[in-house]
Design a protein with these regions (language model features):
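Active-site-surrounding "flap" and adjacent substrate/cofactor-binding loops of secreted or lumenal enzymes
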Residues: 74-104
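Residue-level detector of buried hydrophobic side-chain packing
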Residues: 28, 67-68, 73, 118, ...
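Bacterial N-terminal signal peptides
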Residues: 17-26
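Bacterial N-terminal signal peptides that target proteins for export
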Residues: 3-18
Length: 394
């Protein structure tokens, strides 16, 4: 894990949660205020936690301490601490802080921290094959390249890393793929997440890059299927396979849960990964099994009925993995997910999916917008997070 500490800090996310609780309490008591609220001259209520947020002050030495640990794995030097302390007013301290921040990004230590960050994000690494995907992501970050290359790069997607020098050596993945698509065709990813019907590979893509568990798509209105739950996906119910349209696994079952709520998305993605074997090598036939008795090989009809095409999302077709990569690169939710992961890492939070450490869109709105304006350059996204008020004010 990346070297981190967890200082107690108040964020805008916390404010929103507590404000919502306060509003709920007011509704239950007829709108009366408690001792936690004070009134303005015009009679409006001011929330205590909004006041506390407004009382935060810039502390660039405290921010530097955390940033140095995150970005280099070490504490700042005494000279760095004194440089900020002696800089003068807050504006001058900000300039010194940001200069140190940028200098950290040019060190071998930062490269090592990025390898650790992406290993944790991908939940894989520390062997020659399993390291290639996180090392490629780390290389893109250290070299301030675009996030889009993570899904669209056709060469150099299996680099190696020298932990001593912090240097990356480009190398192509050799797993039988004609046209690579970043980490989506990486042999380590395919081997590590091998499973029945390729669903673990699909889960990896969804959770690592969209920052949510399945179900991934929710319709504006649900549909009563006569079962225990409603159908909430925007996809037509019959757009995936089931016992009634040729599938050997009944994804149309509604007796306990509505399987199609998740599988309406999953089944449109899984066939794209189905021809990779358990070593991550691309073969000419489907290599994954079904969970049925005897573990027979899966067939296309087990995921989708005849005539149904693969896709990233409803209305976003993806005929192959390069097509999927292009679709993901163009998805603003994927970009927002990356900023959210950098945000949680900087502020010492847990994994956004595993621990439900969610980051509201409004909280990182300015950082996400800046990310798009730079062409999704990864190092610039990190700087935007580490210079935000929520990071440097205490």
């Amino acid at each position: 894990m990346t070297a981190q500490e967890n200082p107690m800090r108040t964020t805008s996310t916390l404010a929103r949660v507590l404000a919502a609780a306060a509003l709920a309490g007011a509704a239950c008591t007829g709108g009366t205020t408690s001792g936690d609220d004070t009134g303005d001259d015009d009679g409006t209520t001011v929330d205590e936690w909004d006041q506390k947020l407004a009382e935060r002050e810039y502390d660039y030495n405290a921010a530097l301490r955390i940033a140095s640990l995150r970005l280099t794995g070490r504490l700042p030097t005494l000279a760095e601490v004194k440089a900020i302390a002696d800089a003068g007013d807050v504006a001058a301290q900000k300039v010194v802080y940001e200069s140190f921040l940028r200098s950290y990004l040019d060190t071998p230590e930062f490269a090592n921290q990025m390898v650790r960050f992406w290993r944790d994000t991908f939940k894989m690494g520390e062997s020659a094959m399993l390291d290639t995907a996180p090392v490629f992501a780390a290389q893109l970050t250290v070299e301030n390249r675009s996030l889009t290359e993570l899904f669209t790069a056709t060469t150099g997607t299996c680099p190696t890393f020298n932990a001593t020098t912090g240097e990356f050596t480009a190398a192509d993945c050799a797993n039988g793929v004609t046209t690579h698509a970043g980490v989506l065709t990486n042999p380590g990813v395919q081997a590590h997440f091998f499973s029945n019907m390729a669903f673990r590979r699909v889960r990896f893509v969804q959770e690592a890059f969209a920052c949510t568990a399945f179900p991934a798509e929710i319709a504006d209105a649900s549909v009563d299927m006569g079962g225990a739950q409603a159908y909430t996906s925007p996809w037509p119910f019959q757009s995936i396979a089931g016992a009634d349209n040729g599938g050997t696994v009944d994804f149309h079952d509604t007796s306990a849960v509505v399987c199609a709520n998740c599988h309406s998305t999953m089944n449109h993605l899984a066939p794209l990964f189905a021809n990779f074997d358990d070593q991550g090598q691309l073969q000419t036939t489907i290599q994954v099994k079904t969970p049925n008795d005897g573990a027979p090989d899966a067939q296309m009809s087990d995921w989708l009925p005849a005539g149904e095409a693969t896709a990233w999302r409803l209305g976003v077709p993806a005929a192959d993995l390069p097509g999927l990569g292009q679709a993901m690169a163009a998805d603003p939710k994927v970009a927002e997910c990356t900023v959210a992961r950098f945000w949680n890492w900087a502020l010492g939070k847990g994994d956004i999916v595993d621990t439900l450490s969610l980051v509201p869109t409004a909280t990182i709105e300015s950082q996400t917008a800046a990310f798009a304006q730079t062409g999704y350059t990864l190092q610039d996204a990190i700087i935007a997070v580490y210079t935000s008020d929520d990071f440097v004010k205490f």
